[in-house]
From Swiss-Prot:
Family according to the record: Belongs to the eIF-3 subunit H family.
MF-aspect GO terms: metallopeptidase activity; translation initiation factor activity
Superkingdom to which the source organism belongs: Eukaryota
Any GO BP annotation: formation of cytoplasmic translation initiation complex
Domain MPN: 1-142
Quaternary structure and interacting proteins, as annotated: Component of the eukaryotic translation initiation factor 3 (eIF-3) complex.
Protein source organism: Neosartorya fischeri (strain ATCC 1020 / DSM 3700 / CBS 544.65 / FGSC A1164 / JCM 1740 / NRRL 181 / WB 181) (Aspergillus fischerianus)
CDD domains xref list: MPN_eIF3h
Chief location: cytoplasm
Protein name: Eukaryotic translation initiation factor 3 subunit H
Function, in words: Component of the eukaryotic translation initiation factor 3 (eIF-3) complex, which is involved in protein synthesis of a specialized repertoire of mRNAs and, together with other initiation factors, stimulates binding of mRNA and methionyl-tRNAi to the 40S ribosome. The eIF-3 complex specifically targets and initiates translation of a subset of mRNAs involved in cell proliferation.
Length: 347
């Protein structure tokens, strides 16, 4: 509840905080949390390429390390589980796959404990009626590649690292505390109303009090074909991510063309130098060095493929969300297929 309240209050800006608990028999039990204070990073600071939103970089900020240790010490004094088991962040429309989340989780798994997790609470999706709370860890293969900063095409082909291997999602189960469970059992149940007589006709059923008061009554509004605004926004974000993917692809293709041009120039220079050395050898003159091209030519540096991997993972995230939301609209479209397409009958 603390996590959901904090994320909802700061929405749509990013909210981050620390989670504490215990590791019991291989199960990570989260029992408490507290938010991180937002540290204003000065403009001249270059700490980890600090993001425009200071809250997104708060979990790995040096100023919050002391704050986190002090909070855990005070929790321990009041006999609360005070083992740091990870951190949490808010998300909007599932857009949590970014460099800030990667760097924060890498910091926790490297500096604190490899079993720490990142809890992601999607405020927008939770507002649709179902709680969205997911837990992630960075995979060991991605941790190794990120530590060595090896995200070139050659290294990715050698290691077989794909965008699906960035995160390892863990199952999440939510339980009430024993005090809340005991309180719920003590609540009085409402009195069961006496059974009512069945309506004699359809007209009596439609005009009766049951239709006006119950949400289970037949309602033609449920057949409306209006598109959910949440689904529409997800489609827009998916298109933006696809455009970003095309931009990254064009940048990499530009690098490949530049590399091919430089390699052709180097090959032509080496061929010319070999001919010159052959002529000088025939004249018994000293040969010229053939490795001088390394000083004369500079090969373009291959751009990192990390951003492309993260964007591909974000596209996959949006696609999964859209797939989970189109089921209701698709069912309605098939229900009225016979009326939309004249000449066809439903089979």
């Amino acid at each position: 509840m603390k996590i959901m309240k904090h994320c909802s209050q700061t929405f749509p800006t990013t909210a981050t905080g620390s989670i504490v608990g215990m590791d019991v028999g291989g199960t990570l039990e989260i029992t408490n949390s507290f938010p991180f204070p937002v540290v204003e990073v000065p403009p001249e600071s270059h700490f980890d390429n600090a993001a425009a939103n200071p809250a997104a970089a708060a979990p790995r900020a040096k100023a919050n390390t002391v704050y986190q240790a002090e909070m855990i010490r005070m929790l321990r004094e009041v006999n609360v589980d005070a083992n740091n088991v990870g951190w949490y962040t808010s998300a909007n429309m599932g857009n949590f796959v970014n460099m800030n989340v990667i760097e924060n989780q890498f910091f926790y798994q490297k500096e604190m404990n490899e079993r720490t997790v990142a809890l992601v609470h999607d405020v927008s999706r939770s507002s649709q009626g179902s709680l969205s709370l997911r837990a992630f860890r960075l995979s060991p293969r991605f941790m190794t590649a990120f530590k060595e900063n090896k995200f070139t095409s050659e290294e990715l082909q050698k290691s077989g690292l794909r965008y699906q291997d960035i995160f390892v999602e863990l199952p999440v189960e939510i339980h009430n505390s024993h005090l809340i469970t005991s309180f719920i059992h003590q609540l009085q149940t409402p009195n069961i109303p006496a059974p009512t007589d069945l309506p004699p006709s359809l007209a009596a059923l439609e005009s009766g009090p049951f239709v006006k008061s119950s949400i289970l009554a037949p309602n033609y509004d449920n057949l409306t074909l209006s598109i959910d605004p949440f689904l529409e926004k997800n489609c827009d974000l998916l298109l933006d991510s696809i455009e970003t993917h095309h931009t990254e692809t064009n940048n990499f293709q530009y690098y490949q063309r530049s590399l091919a041009r430089e390699q052709q120039r180097i090959s032509a220079w080496q061929q010319k130098r070999k001919q010159e050395n052959a002529t000088r050898a025939a004249l018994k003159q000293p040969l010229l060095p053939e490795d001088e091209w390394q000083r004369l030519f500079k090969l373009p540096q291959e751009p990192s493929r990390l951003e492309s991997m993260l964007n591909s993972r974000q596209v996959d995230q949006y696609a999964r969300q859209i797939d989970s939301f189109v089921s209701s609209t698709t069912g309605k479209m098939f229900a009225v297929k016979g009326n939309l397409l004249p000449g066809e009958t439903a089979k």
